[in-house]
């Protein structure tokens, strides 16, 4: 195996090799002899651009003799500059695998932000060990390696057979078998999987492809993400259960804002929910109705709707102001069309307070216990619509709703469709192993995700550790920012912020 002609020509300089022979560096390090027939050519990413073959040789040689190193360089630069990745071939397969186990996702080189990425080059994948290695489960603990070889040798040449044993040297009831080709391994699976129940086993024999390193990392990340999302859900549910006492506090703030006409302190709420002074006044009145409903629901008042109805009568809207015969029900219908309650609830869900959600829940409960009387059917219908609109924002705290949403939004992974202004997020500091599905699952609890994309380096085929998520509304985006910005995954904390508009020079 020789250095490809495309390798960049550098000045010839003599390098002293560990075996005492001299060798020239001409874009790669070559030896006069050849590597083993089963040697693996490895791709290595996340290396400093300033490193040459000499520094890389010093990095790899502790794991075995190096046959060849080829740094990928950008020919458009003069002189050509390293792309931060290379190919390395050891003399033995064992040395390559030992280097991968010691370096991949473990060692971070000076000046780099992410650990080394080391895997078989694309040219090696056609016959990679991981594609020919089988896991054999439900094996009798009385079997040894020879018994397993005899059992699987009819399907082709076996390169390796190993039974997993505990510290005491006893079999754990499973084994690994590596064939010479993938076709042999596939034939063994078809013929042997669940074909018999061996002595001392409770289930038929299991024959399948062994988990790859990527499978193991993906499963570890999924478990870690599931644990962290469970913690987030638990914290959110704790906030939801204690919302009853928040209504009076925020009712006072809203009343103060509407009575003083000085809404400067609430500018953030206005911008987030798109509210004007009239809408804030409506919200304050509705909160008062919620408080009255909470009181009347626990009292023996024969007509608990009276105080609530009087409070609802004060609701105003552009429609009600221009129509002399408008009723409280009409005012409520116009209020629901404004989306005010949904905006405020969505902006605060799962964080410190969800006063709008609590108010609507109390109001819905108080009215629902009394039935539809005295012409309040229109009002009840409007309240039900408003409350139903808010319920979607509690999905972050309800695992069942989360699971349903997961099934509905799988098509969003990998797409790059943009949502409305203010609904598109930029996420940085993603783990190297995260893909489109991982980022989708992480941000789905906060609303309807229409696209989720992790960006990949076209040269190295590795994640750039950032991506974009788009919702169908700005409220969900704000909820995701407040909940996930600074959220820790492994050793990193996510950076979540709004994606800049197309008018800006940079997307983030």
UniProtKB/Swiss-Prot annotation:
Stored Pfam families: RRM_1
GO CC annotation, single: ribonucleoprotein complex
Every RRM domain range: 40-123, 132-212, 423-501
Family matches, as Gene3D superfamilies: 3.30.70.330
Statement: the UniProt record of this protein carries the keyword Disulfide bond: no
GO biological process: mRNA splice site recognition; post-transcriptional gene silencing; regulation of alternative mRNA splicing, via spliceosome
Positions of the UniProt region annotated as Necessary for RNA-binding, TNNT2 exon 5 and NMDA R1 exon 21 inclusion: 1-283, 357-508
Disulfide linkage: none
Chief localization: nucleus
SMART domains for this protein: RRM
Keyword Cell division: no
Tissue distribution of the protein: Strongly expressed in forebrain regions, including the cerebral cortex and hippocampus. Moderately expressed in hindbrain regions, including the cerebellum and spinal cord.
MF terms in GO: lncRNA binding; mRNA 3'-UTR binding; pre-mRNA binding; RNA binding
Keywords, sorted A to Z: Cytoplasm, mRNA processing, Nucleus, Repeat, Repressor, RNA-binding
Compartments, as annotated in UniProt: Nucleus; Cytoplasm
Similarity annotation: Belongs to the CELF/BRUNOL family.
Subunit record text: Interacts with A1CF.
Function statement: RNA-binding protein implicated in the regulation of several post-transcriptional events. Involved in pre-mRNA alternative splicing, mRNA translation and stability. Mediates exon inclusion and/or exclusion in pre-mRNA that are subject to tissue-specific and developmentally regulated alternative splicing. Specifically activates exon 5 inclusion of TNNT2 in embryonic, but not adult, skeletal muscle. Activates TNNT2 exon 5 inclusion by antagonizing the repressive effect of PTB.
Listed name of the protein: CUGBP Elav-like family member 2
Organism: Rattus norvegicus
Gene name, Swiss-Prot/TrEMBL: Celf2
